[in-house]
C-alpha cells in the first residue's frame, strides 16, 4: 500500500501540520514530525477524525465535562473565547457520557476532576480494543515517553496567565499532580512491568499535550489579536501624520463565521465559531506570529518544574524576558532614532609627532574608523591606537582641507627661558625699579663697615675675624628712592660668590683702602664687573688715616682699566670714610645718578623670576633661601621652582626680619617652604600651579642626577696609567658643614686648591646646617673628619663622635681652616730620610773565631762608629758590602760607640769576609723635616 506524509494530509484538510501530528499521536500512530509517513488507511483514520470533530450537533444542554478520548480536538479548534470550555469537547465526542451542570459564571474555569475520570474510562476501553499491542522498538518508546514528559513541562508554562488569573493556582496544582502521576506511572512500569494491566502512557501523554496545546492556542490567539490591534493603531497614527485631512481607515473586521447549529444563539458561540473559521483558514500573518512564538515554546519545553512555578508566579519576570528578546512587544511605539550631530571641521589643526588616530579623531570631531579608512586609501595601514608621524598627519589634514601646524614643544622644566624669552615681559607694563648695587673689594678694606653705615646697624661687629663670610642683601631709602645693596666677601676663597653678585647687580661699588691701594681681590672684582658689563663706582675708603694716598689709588686703578671721569674715563670716584660717615651722601647721590642714566625698569605684573643670593638649612624652618626678585611680583603661597628644588612660598621676610606678603622687583627676601636647600646662584621662577612646579622641579633634579652620573670618571686605556699612579697618592677624607651654601662652596673650592705632593683632599659630603648624627656615622664609615664652619654639632652628634672616635673641627675663619688642612695633609705623607756619614774606621787585624765568625780589629780615623749605625765595607774604593753591625766592643766590653783615635772590635751581621786594610764607613738615615 502507498504511504502518505502528514503535511500532505494537513494541506488537504486545510489544517496546520502540528495539529495533524498531534491527532496522529492521539490515534496511537508512531509518528515524530510533519514529515513522517503513514499508511493510506491510517491517513483515512486521521481525516475521518477531523471530519467527526467538525460534524454539527444539537446542543440540547450545556455539558460541564465529557469523557476524553484519544481523538482530541486540535489545539486551535479547542480554543474557546467567551464561551463554555466544554462545549467543543461535547461536540467532538457525542457518544461520551455527560453530566448536566448549572451554567458557569466564569467561562475560564474547568472541572479537571471530571475530565480525568472521563479520560481514565476511555483509556480502559481503548486498551480492550488494542489488546496486547506493544511498541516495535522498546527503546524508541522509552525515548518518546521522555519527550512527552518534557513537552508536558514546557507546555504547562505556555498557558494564558493574563486572561485566566483565577485558574493559575488550580492549573499549577493539577499540572503538578499530573506530572507526579506520570512519573510514578513511568517508574512503576519500569519496575513492575510484568504485573497488572498495562497502561498506555503514550496515549495519556498525547491527551495531556493536546489539552495544553489548546490552552496555549487560546493565549496565542489573544496575543496575536492584541498585536494586530497595536499594528493597526500604529498604522492609523502614521497615516494621520502623513495625511492629516484623510479619513482614518476602518478597523479590520474578522471574517464572518459559518452558521453553526445552536439551541440558544448567543454572542459567545458566534465568537467561538468566528475564531474557528479564522483558524481553519491559512493566514500568512497568523503563521508568522505562530513561528515567532514557536521559539520561546521550544526553549520552555526543557525547563524544570521549579522554573515553571517561578514563571507562573512572577508573570512580570517572564514578560520582561520576552521584551528583552524583542517578542510580544509590538504594542509599544518604537523609540525615535537619535540623529547624529554634524560637527564642522576646524580650519587649523595643531599637531605633535606621535599623535594617535584616536587623538586626531577627537580633535577634529570625526570617527576613528573614518580616519583609518582615509589612511588606508592613502596607503597607510593604521589602527586607532597607532601613532602617526608628522608627514602623515599633514597629508591627512590636506585630505580634510585643514591647515596643519606643528606645535612647538616647550620645555616646562627650563627656567632659563623666562629670562631670555622676549614675550614673557610686557613692554607696556614696565615701571621703574630700584637699582641693585654690589659692594666689592679686598679683605678689610671697609666693605661691611660701609654697608653698616648705610643701614645704621652693627652688622660688621658680628663678622668673625673682621671679614664677611657670606653675602647679604639689604635695602635702604635715599631721597624717596630705594636702593638694594648686596655685600660680597673679599677673601680669595669667595671668588664664586663675588662672581654671583656681579651677575645680578646693576652697579658695582669698588671699595679700595686709601692706605693699601689695589690688592689681588680688587683686581678680581674689577674683572667680574667688566665681565658682567656693570658700571663701576670707586669708593676710596679710609681717607681719615694718616697714610692715606687717594691719588696713588687712582693711578693704580687706571693701570687696570678703571679710569676716573676727571681723567676722561667713565667711572665715578668718591673719597669716603665709612668709619666716620664722611661723603656717604655723595656716594648715594652718585649711585642714583648712574641708575637714572641706565633707565632700570621691570614688569611687576608677570610671575616672579629671579636669582638665589644665599641658601641655608635652618633647624626649625627647614630650607631657607635668600632671593632677589628681578622681574614680576612674588607673593606668599606662590608655587615656585628654585634650581633643582620646588615648593610653595610658606613665609617671606625682608632684610629687617619682618614678614611680608608681597615682594616686587629688585627686592631681596628670605623664603621658606622648599623641599630641599637650593644652590646659591640658581635661578627661580613662579609657576601657575603646584602640580606644574612639582613636575618641573622633579624633572630638573632628575636631569642634574643624570648629568652627575655622566660626569663620573671612568678608566680608559689613556688614563689607566694615571689611575694606577693615583692609587699611590694618599687621601684625606673631609665632611664640610657650614651655615650657608656660599660658605660651603668657598670651603670646597679652597680645599681643592691645596697642593701637597702625594696627598689629596676628598670631600665626602658637604651641606648646610648643624652637624648631626648622620654626619658622624658617615665620617666613621669613610674614615673622615668633620669641618664645621659657623655651625655646631648637636648633643647627640657630639656624644656619638666621642664614642666612635670621630674628629670634629669647628672654625669661623676660612683661612684658618685652609692652614689647618695644609698641616694635616703634610702629616699624611711618609717621612723622607737622607744618609749621613758619621765616621770611618780602618781594619788593622782580623780574628776568625769558630762558631762566631770573623772579628775585625779597627781604629777610628774619622768621626765615630756607633752600635746602631749602618756600615759599608769598602775595598780598593769599591763598596763590597752594606749592612748592619752585629757587635761593637772596646777590648772585651760591649760599647755603644767608639770615638775618633780609639781602637775596637766589630762583627758585621751576615758578612765574614773582612780583610786587613778594608775601610769601614759608618752612616745613619736621618729624617727630613718638611
Swiss-Prot record:
tr-type G domain ranges (all copies): 432-599
Residue spans crossing the bilayer: none
Main location, first listed in the record: cytoplasm
Keyword Cytoplasm among UniProt keywords: yes
Residue ranges, annotated region (G5): 577-579
Location of region: G1: 441-448
Positions of the UniProt region annotated as G3: 487-490
Biased composition (Basic and acidic residues): 112-128, 136-178, 218-245, 280-297
Renumbered residue ranges of the record's region G4: 541-544
Pfam families: EF-G_D2 (PF22042), GTP_EFTU (PF00009), IF-2 (PF11987), IF2_N (PF04760)
Positions of region (Disordered): 27-342
Biased composition (Pro residues): 251-268
UniProt keyword list: Cytoplasm, GTP-binding, Initiation factor, Nucleotide-binding, Protein biosynthesis
Region feature G2, mapped onto this chain: 466-470
Ranges annotated as biased composition (Polar residues): 183-195
Biased composition (Low complexity): 52-103, 302-318
Localization of this protein: Cytoplasm
Entry's Gene Ontology molecular function annotations: GTP binding; GTPase activity; translation initiation factor activity
UniProt-listed InterPro entries: EF-G-like_DII, IF2_II, IF2_N, P-loop_NTPase, Small_GTP-bd, T_Tr_GTP-bd_dom, TF_IF2_bacterial-like, TIF_IF2
Family listed: Belongs to the TRAFAC class translation factor GTPase superfamily. Classic translation factor GTPase family. IF-2 subfamily.
PANTHER family: TR-TYPE G DOMAIN-CONTAINING PROTEIN (PTHR43381:SF5), TRANSLATION INITIATION FACTOR IF-2-RELATED (PTHR43381)
Task of the protein: One of the essential components for the initiation of protein synthesis. Protects formylmethionyl-tRNA from spontaneous hydrolysis and promotes its binding to the 30S ribosomal subunits. Also involved in the hydrolysis of GTP during the formation of the 70S ribosomal complex.
Protein name: Translation initiation factor IF-2
Amino acid at each position: 500500500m502507498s504511504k502518505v506524509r502528514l503535511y500532505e494530509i494537513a494541506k488537504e484538510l486545510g489544517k496546520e501540520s502540528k495539529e495533524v501530528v498531534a491527532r496522529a499521536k492521539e490515534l496511537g500512530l508512531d509518528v515524530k514530525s510533519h514529515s513522517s509517513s503513514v499508511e493510506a488507511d491510517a491517513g483515512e483514520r486521521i481525516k475521518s477524525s477531523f471530519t467527526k470533530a467538525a460534524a454539527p450537533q444539537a446542543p440540547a444542554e450545556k455539558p460541564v465535562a465529557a469523557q476524553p478520548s484519544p481523538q482530541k480536538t486540535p489545539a486551535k479548534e479547542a480554543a474557546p473565547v467567551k464561551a463554555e470550555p466544554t462545549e467543543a469537547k461535547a461536540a467532538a465526542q457525542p457518544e461520551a457520557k455527560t453530566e448536566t451542570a448549572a451554567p458557569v459564571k466564569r467561562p475560564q474555569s474547568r472541572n479537571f476532576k471530571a475530565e480525568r475520570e472521563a479520560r481514565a474510562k476511555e483509556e480502559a476501553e481503548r486498551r480492550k480494543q488494542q489488546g496486547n499491542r506493544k511498541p516495535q522498538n522498546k527503546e524508541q518508546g522509552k525515548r518518546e515517553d521522555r519527550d512527552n514528559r518534557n513537552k508536558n513541562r514546557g507546555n504547562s508554562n505556555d498557558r494564558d496567565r493574563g486572561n485566566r488569573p483565577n485558574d493559575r493556582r488550580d492549573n499549577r496544582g493539577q499540572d503538578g499532580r499530573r506530572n507526579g502521576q506520570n512519573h510514578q506511572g513511568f517508574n512503576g512500569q519500569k519496575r513492575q512491568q510484568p504485573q497488572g494491566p498495562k497502561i498506555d502512557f503514550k496515549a495519556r501523554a498525547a491527551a495531556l499535550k493536546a489539552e495544553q496545546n489548546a490552552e496555549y492556542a487560546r493565549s496565542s490567539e489573544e496575543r496575536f489579536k492584541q498585536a494586530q490591534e497595536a499594528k493597526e493603531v500604529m498604522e492609523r497614527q502614521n497615516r494621520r501624520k502623513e495625511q492629516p485631512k484623510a479619513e482614518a481607515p476602518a478597523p479590520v473586521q474578522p471574517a464572518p463565521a459559518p452558521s453553526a447549529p445552536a439551541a440558544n444563539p448567543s454572542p459567545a458561540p458566534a465568537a467561538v465559531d468566528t475564531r474557528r473559521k479564522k483558524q481553519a483558514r491559512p493566514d500568512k500573518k497568523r503563521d508568522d506570529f505562530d513561528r515567532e512564538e514557536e521559539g520561546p515554546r521550544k526553549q520552555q519545553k526543557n525547563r524544570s518544574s521549579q522554573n515553571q512555578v517561578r514563571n507562573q508566579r512572577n508573570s512580570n519576570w517572564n514578560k520582561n524576558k520576552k521584551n528583552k528578546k524583542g517578542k510580544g512587544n509590538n504594542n509599544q511605539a518604537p523609540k525615535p532614532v537619535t540623529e547624529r550631530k554634524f560637527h564642522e571641521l576646524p580650519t587649523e589643526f595643531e599637531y605633535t609627532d606621535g599623535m594617535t588616530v584616536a587623538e586626531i579623531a577627537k580633535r577634529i570631531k570625526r570617527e576613528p574608523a573614518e580616519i583609518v579608512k582615509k589612511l588606508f586609501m592613502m596607503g597607510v595601514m593604521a589602527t586607532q591606537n597607532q601613532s602617526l608621524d608628522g608627514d602623515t598627519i599633514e597629508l591627512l589634514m590636506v585630505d580634510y582641507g585643514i591647515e596643519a601646524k606643528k606645535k612647538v614643544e616647550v620645555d616646562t622644566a627650563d627656567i632659563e627661558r623666562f629670562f631670555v624669552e622676549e614675550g614673557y615681559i610686557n613692554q607696556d607694563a614696565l615701571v621703574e625699579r630700584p637699582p641693585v648695587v654690589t659692594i666689592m673689594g679686598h679683605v678689610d678694606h671697609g666693605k661691611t663697615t660701609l654697608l653698616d653705615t648705610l643701614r645704621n646697624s652693627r652688622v660688621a661687629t658680628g663678622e668673625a675675624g673682621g671679614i664677611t663670610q657670606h653675602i647679604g642683601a639689604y635695602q635702604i631709602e635715599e631721597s624717596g628712592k630705594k636702593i638694594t645693596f648686596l655685600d660680597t666677601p673679599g677673601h680669595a676663597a669667595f671668588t664664586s660668590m663675588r662672581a654671583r653678585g656681579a651677575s645680578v647687580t646693576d652697579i658695582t661699588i669698588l671699595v679700595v683702602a686709601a692706605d693699601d691701594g689695589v690688592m689681588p681681590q680688587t683686581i678680581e672684582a674689577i674683572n667680574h664687573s667688566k665681565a658682567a658689563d656693570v658700571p663701576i663706582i670707586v669708593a676710596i675708603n679710609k681717607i681719615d688715616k694718616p697714610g692715606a694716598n687717594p691719588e696713588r689709588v687712582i693711578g693704580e686703578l687706571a693701570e687696570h682699566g678703571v679710569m676716573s671721569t676727571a681723567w676722561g674715563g667713565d667711572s665715578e670716584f668718591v673719597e669716603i670714610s665709612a668709619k666716620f660717615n664722611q661723603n656717604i651722601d655723595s656716594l648715594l647721590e652718585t649711585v642714583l645718578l648712574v641708575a637714572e642714566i641706565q633707565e632700570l625698569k621691570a614688569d611687576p605684573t608677570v610671575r616672579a623670576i629671579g636669582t638665589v643670593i644665599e641658601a641655608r638649612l635652618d633647624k626649625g624652618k627647614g630650607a631657607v633661601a635668600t632671593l632677589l626678585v628681578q622681574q614680576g611680583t612674588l607673593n606668599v603661597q606662590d608655587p615656585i621652582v628654585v634650581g633643582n628644588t620646588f615648593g610653595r612660598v610658606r613665609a617671606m621676610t625682608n632684610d629687617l626680619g619682618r614678614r611680608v606678603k608681597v615682594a616686587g622687583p629688585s627686592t631681596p627676601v628670605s623664603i621658606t617652604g622648599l623641599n630641599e636647600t637650593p644652590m646659591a646662584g640658581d635661578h627661580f621662577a613662579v609657576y601657575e600651579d603646584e602640580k606644574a612646579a612639582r613636575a618641573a622641579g622633579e624633572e630638573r633634579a632628575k636631569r642634574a642626577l643624570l648629568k652627575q652620573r655622566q660626569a663620573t670618571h671612568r678608566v680608559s686605556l689613556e688614563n689607566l696609567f694615571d689611575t694606577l699612579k693615583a692609587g699611590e697618592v694618599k687621601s684625606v677624607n673631609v665632611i664640610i658643614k657650614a651655615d650657608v651654601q656660599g660658605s660651603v662652596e668657598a670651603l670646597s673650592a679652597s680645599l681643592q686648591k691645596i697642593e701637597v705632593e702625594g696627598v689629596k683632599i676628598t670631600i665626602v659630603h658637604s651641606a648646610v646646617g648643624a652637624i648631626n648624627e648622620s654626619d658622624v656615622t658617615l665620617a666613621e664609615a669613610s674614615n673622615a673628619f668633620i669641618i664645621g664652619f659657623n655651625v655646631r654639632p648637636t648633643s647627640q652628634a657630639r656624644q656619638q663622635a666621642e664614642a666612635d672616635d670621630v674628629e670634629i673641627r669647628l672654625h669661623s675663619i676660612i683661612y684658618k681652616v685652609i692652614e689647618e688642612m695644609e698641616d694635616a695633609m703634610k702629616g699624611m705623607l711618609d717621612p723622607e730620610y737622607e744618609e749621613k756619614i758619621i765616621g770611618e774606621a780602618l781594619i788593622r787585624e782580623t780574628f776568625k773565631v769558630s762558631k762566631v765568625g770573623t772579628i775585625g780589629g779597627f781604629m777610628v780615623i774619622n768621626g765615630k762608629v756607633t752600635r746602631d749605625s749602618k756600615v759599608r765595607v769598602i775595598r780598593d774604593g769599591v763598596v763590597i758590602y752594606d749592612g748592619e753591625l752585629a757587635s761593637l766592643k772596646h777590648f772585651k766590653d760591649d760599647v755603644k760607640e767608639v770615638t775618633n783615635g780609639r781602637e775596637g772590635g766589630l762583627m758585621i751581621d751576615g758578612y765574614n769576609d773582612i780583610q786587613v786594610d778594608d775601610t769601614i764607613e759608618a752612616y745613619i738615615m736621618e729624617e727630613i723635616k718638611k
